[in-house]
Amino acid sequence: MGQSAFLTNLSGYIPGSFKFVELLDRFYAAQHETGFIHRDVTFGTSEAYAQAFDPNSTGPNLLAWSEWRAFRLTGDKNRIAAVFPALMAHHRWCRDNRTWRNGLYWTTGYASELINQPRVPNGRYHHRHWAWIDACSQAVLNCTMLERMALLLEEAEMATEVATEQDRLIRVINSVMWNGELNFYQDVGPDGVFSPLKSIAAYWALLDAKLIPKDRLSPFIQHLRDTWSFRTEFVLPTLSADSDAYNARTGNGWRGAVWPHLTYMVQRGLNVAQHFPLAHKLALNHVDMVSRVHTSTDKFWENYMSEDLGPAEPMTEDVSGLTPAAIIPMVLEFVLGFSVDWPLRQIIWRRSLSPEQVYGVRNLPLGNEGTIDLLSDEDTIQIRTDAPITLIIHDNKEIFQTAVPAGEFALSLK
């Protein structure tokens, strides 16, 4: 379920009739009447492998997050209307069956897709009665996505329902799951003890702008800058380098290896938090590393070493497309700096690369209304667009905004 959600990052970026977001349809087809959706469904069928009350049966719940992103890139409101009932029903099932009395959510190592990360003792296949920070943060994010969908579809009661849950959940997360000594969000046991590890799972909290109080945001993000924490030579490790279980030599799965889709997730969170320069720097580091390894091995890999150049162990070639599905939007959004919001007919371009050479993008899809080319040097942006847009340019601490009609134009930055 989680990997399929990440594959949909390509939705809106690949021209043609195939829509990556439709990969999620097989999960909706397998949905139980209760609202439960299995995490494992075979391609081409609605056959599911897990039973609902198996602790490992579902998650991570990223479906609404992926659907809303696809909507912002394509403007396909009809799809939101079609999938919203399934998304709302699954959220309610998770709220009824994956929470503790205080409203915090649980998962397992397996269901979280950080399978061998020892953040919760003996938690690979069982929740151990802990509250898990990624499941809680994803639930907050899910509430935001569902509220936006409900408002779009004029479903006021359901918008209020998820907004009320979110307010309560944010309060409890910040009361219980913030480790003030470390300035970090962590899993919490039934006795109130924090996990002994700093996991990349905590950075799901960045994806919702309402979750982290302002006074906690900068120290929480600082861990992504500290070389003894998450700022290893190649970014970002799934465990901080100062965690006891961190494995610098092999990566050992989720005990320190770098997974491109999780690095991209953190960059998306930094974008929400408006820490754009850091997201850009992390993207440059990561894309360069993946490119160098691809040059030497002629392969994309599921995960990479954090302190040496090469694939991490277990050494597994990426055959699902998960790594390119992270790298392509990472290049477009955080290296080149493009952000498309098609319902608003708007493109933001944060120009962070050196303008000494011409750079930009060709054939960037504009929903279903054609494509756009945006190429620039230091002084001029060359534009060819099939549809009128609003273009907002962030350049050298200056912001330019202009309405661009369909056609070909040169825009001076002098």
Question: Language model features by range: what are they?
Answer:
Residues 1-108, 132-136, 140, 256-273, ...:
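Aromatic-rich carbohydrate-recognition surfaces in CAZymes
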Residues 8, 166, 205:
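Conserved hydrophobic/aromatic pocket- or pore-lining residues that grip, position, or stack substrates
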Residues 14, 81, 126-133, 153-156, ...:
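Charge-dense, low-complexity intrinsically disordered segments
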Residues 16-30, 77-97, 142, 146-174, ...:
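Extended, well-ordered alpha-helical scaffold segments
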Residues 20, 64, 147, 160-171, ...:
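Solvent-exposed, well-ordered amphipathic alpha-helical segments
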Residues 22-54, 99-131, 171-258, 291-313, ...:
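Extended glycan-interaction surfaces of carbohydrate-active proteins
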Residues 127-141, 158-161, 165, 197, ...:
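Short, contiguous, pocket-lining structural segments
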Residues 221-230, 265-414:
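Non-catalytic C-terminal accessory modules of carbohydrate-active enzymes
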